Amino acid sequence: MSYRMFDYLVPNVNFFGPNAISVVGERCKLLGGKKALLVTDKGLRAIKDGAVDKTLTHLREAGIDVVVFDGVEPNPKDTNVRDGLEVFRKEHCDIIVTVGGGSPHDCGKGIGIAATHEGDLYSYAGIETLTNPLPPIVAVNTTAGTASEVTRHCVLTNTKTKVKFVIVSWRNLPSVSINDPLLMLGKPAPLTAATGMDALTHAVEAYISKDANPVTDAAAIQAIRLIARNLRQAVALGSNLKARENMAYASLLAGMAFNNANLGYVHAMAHQLGGLYDMPHGVANAVLLPHVARYNLIANPEKFADIAEFMGENTDGLSTMDAAELAIHAIARLSADIGIPQHLRDLGVKEADFPYMAEMALKDGNAFSNPRKGNEKEIAEIFRQAF
């Protein structure tokens, strides 16, 4: 087998496993941190002896001063970044610790960008637009889904235009990522379901991406297998540590895959739903994934047939196209089994917005690695099929 040249980016240091949170203080110290801005949301901060309290304890034990910014919203806004930056500067912080899922991680990256780059954040939307080093970021992850703790992506919402934009740069990579499955125990079933489908979408889109390579394929394949075998159990019983560990590992692998292979139309379209309707990102991905998969099927039926097998479908004796169809059914069945809404109409979406969302989706950075090139009419039709 011959290989074309490819690069592969991951954070400098990654810690995984029960009690991994215990290293957060010493790692901040090794990075030269003296005063940390802990970025999180009000819900996580309110949990007694939860991830935020544990992080604070370990930071203080290591001699790190901490100030907490808990103003992060779901689908983090540019205004959240502005407010966090004000605290970062006022308190003279020199390191950022993010605690939570994708929203705190992306907001923390945004604060780091704003602290080191002039101008409007939106002006940096795109790939490798950042020119200055960010403050060190230590990402403590609490959900199995977005994998922002291991990626170069910073996804924010422009509150003026209600458009989600992505800043993709190796400078966004956290210096340290921490995945402690014990911090994920007991998460609500709807959150577990949505973030789990986000992870599956990462793995599937990375696997079929035009930018996929052998390393990203290996990570995506294992992620798909683990999610197919463990997501239902994690949703059904939040205290199932084995299922939580496997989902955390799957999310990590899927993140490492799409961090390098990029994504596709599911994310490009989901970003429009998140920006316009503030729809939870994982839910948007889950509703769209089967429909975008059907659209992409003819572009790479062999890989979709593989996905069917990875998800436990019996493809013996089937043609490649018939086996590929099973992948779509397996994805849709998993989503339904864990209680994800199946139609955009059930989520308050308006058909009148489809043309605009289709136009914006094709401008999203994730669209360019999709295996099949579409137009606005086709993307609007996918929205209608999901409606």
UniProtKB/Swiss-Prot annotation:
Keywords: Iron, NAD, Oxidoreductase
Any GO MF annotation of the entry: 1,3-propanediol dehydrogenase activity
EC number: 1.1.1.202
Name listed for the protein in its UniProt record: 1,3-propanediol dehydrogenase
Gene name for this UniProt entry: dhaT
Statement: the UniProt record of this protein carries the keyword NAD: yes
Subunit structure comment from the entry: Homooctamer.
Regulation: Inhibited by the metal chelator 1,10-phenanthroline.
